[in-house]
From Swiss-Prot:
One of its GO terms (biological process) is mitotic G2 DNA damage checkpoint signaling. It comes from the Eukaryota. InterPro entries: Hist-Lys_N-MTase_N, Set9_fungi, SET_dom, SET_dom_sf, Suv4-20/Set9. Its EC number is 2.1.1.372. Belongs to the class V-like SAM-binding methyltransferase superfamily. Histone-lysine methyltransferase family. Suvar4-20 subfamily. CDD domains: SET_Suv4-20-like. It holds the Pfam family SET. GO terms for cellular component: cell division site; chromatin; cytosol; mitotic spindle pole body; nucleus. Its main location: nucleus. It comes from Schizosaccharomyces pombe (strain 972 / ATCC 24843) (Fission yeast). The lineage of its organism: Eukaryota, Fungi, Dikarya, Ascomycota, Taphrinomycotina. This is Histone-lysine N-methyltransferase set9. Gene3D superfamilies: Histone-lysine N-methyltransferase, SET domain. Keywords: Chromatin regulator, Chromosome, Methyltransferase, Nucleus, S-adenosyl-L-methionine, Transferase.
Length: 441
């Protein structure tokens, strides 16, 4: 394993080890993008069953983070790393382990999942999905992370060949690397959370009510995806047909070629189940109504975002969605008139559906009703990877995690049944042993 000389490399290694052991190896169907790729091969080749057993026993059943972290630190594959750490670094690594172990607590209100929203990527990107309702103003303390102050040299070298963002802290007056589970939270122009901080710890605070199954998002910055986020591909921009989706939206509605579908296209669309065809949801209709009335997205940069933090990328790099930019730039815009027609909007979403999924089969989960892509599954009533992973870990259907409550309920029912049986038994015994009345005495 490579010697880690800098504070940045040490904490980057911590995060890579934690994501490798506590996400990738815990029934996760994809692979988390690593920060520096410093993880030793012996750690990458570790068997997942021992890690899952620790999570099941000490986190899901006993909710004991300390004991779980203690058992993980005893893996012999971690010895080369632990021997090089000072006592302070060991405490920091243990604390980082607990951040990721907290993801599996029964009280945790979210789940690390994946999304195909950004179809430039060759694989699904990580995202955070709410498992329970989260009220506005509530701190999502388990969705936290650590900020690492960067030197100018580290800022120039960070993420070479990668696409990692960094935080700018006005309090620290420095660029900082953002590590921990909260780094999986994606950007949205109409975000439902904002950053909150205490010391070097950072977490998310809910700014509006979040429903179960809704993605937890935050606002990065006003110019993170180009000038005024003109290249943004978030869910809100997709529903509005603006920014990165603007060219595709206008082309879908104005191009005459789009209206004349080939028979193969029609057959492909009709072969999809009704639930898999795009139907304008009530949530999308509300977005359309806002647009029709001349409304705009909420200004998260001024109202929802903690002013201390905003996300940037190094100046020598650009965040480029290469495939989307190429696809959208190749489409000629023939008309720039406002598009307020619901039919145009439906056509835009259908075209986007085809571009995002191609000819791959799309299924609808039998449990959570979310659509997903899995070419290995033959049964259209299959469960999505999120629900399969959840069921393996908690032995309960998503989103329920409270296994302890279920066991207490079963024990209580068993106790009631036992008492009922005792009452019935004593009653029958009293009838059998009741003395006969002597009428002659």
């Amino acid at each position: 394993m490579r010697q880690t000389n800098t504070h940045l490399e040490t904490f980057s290694l911590f995060d890579d080890v934690c994501t490798c052991l506590l996400v990738d190896k815990v029934f996760y169907w994809s692979q988390i993008h690593k920060v520096r790729k410093l993880v030793d091969r012996s750690i990458e080749r570790m068997e997942s069953c021992s890690i899952i057993n620790i999570i099941t026993k000490y986190i899901i059943e006993q909710t004991d983070l300390d004991q779980a972290a203690k058992n993980i630190l005893q893996f012999r594959e971690l010895d080369p790393l632990l021997r090089r750490l000072s006592s302070t670094s060991l405490l920091a690594f243990t604390r980082h382990l607990k951040y990721y172990l907290s993801l599996y607590l029964p009280s945790c209100k979210f789940e690390i999942c994946s999304t195909n929203q950004y179809f430039s990527s060759s694989k699904p990107e990580a995202c955070v999905i709410a498992r329970e309702s989260i009220n506005a103003g509530e701190d999502i303390t388990d969705l936290c992370g650590t900020i690492i102050k960067l030197s100018p040299k580290e800022e120039r070298n960070i993420g070479i060949g990668k696409d990692f963002s960094i935080l700018h802290s006005s309090r620290l007056d420095s660029m900082c690397l953002f590590l921990g589970p909260a780094r999986f939270v994606n950007h949205d122009c109409n975000a439902n959370c904002r950053f909150n901080t205490s010391g070097k710890r950072i977490w998310l605070r809910c700014v509006r009510d979040i429903k179960p199954g809704e993605e937890i998002t935050t606002f990065y910055s006003s110019n993170y995806f180009g000038l005024e986020n003109c290249e943004c591909l978030c869910v809100s921009c997709e529903r509005m047909g603006i920014n990165g989706f603007k060219k595709l939206f206008h082309t879908s509605a104005t191009s005459t070629s789009c209206s004349s579908k080939s028979s193969s296209d029609v057959s492909d669309l009709s072969s999809l189940p009704q639930s898999n065809r795009y139907v304008i949801s009530e949530e999308d209709r509300s977005f359309l109504n806002i647009w029709d009335s001349g409304g705009e997205l909420s200004d998260a940069s001024s109202s929802d975002l903690d002013e201390e933090f905003s996300l940037f990328i190094p100046r020598h790099k650009k965040r480029v969605w290469s495939r989307e930019k190429r696809l959208l730039s190749e489409m000629a815009i023939t008309n720039h008139s406002p598009l307020l027609n619901v039919d145009d909007y439906r056509k835009f979403r259908e075209d986007l559906w085809k571009k995002r999924h191609g000819k791959r089969k799309v299924y609808q989960c039998s449990n959570c009703s979310q659509t997903f892509i899995n070419e290995d599954i033959q049964n259209s009533s299959a469960f999505c990877p999120k629900c399969i992973r959840h069921s393996k870990l908690f032995s309960l259907p998503w989103p329920c995690r409270h296994k302890v409550n279920r066991e207490l309920k079963l024990e209580k029912e068993k106790e009631i049944n036992t008492k009922r049986n005792l009452v019935t038994s004593s009653h029958s015994m009293s009838l059998r042993h009741k003395k006969a009345v002597d009428y002659q005495s």
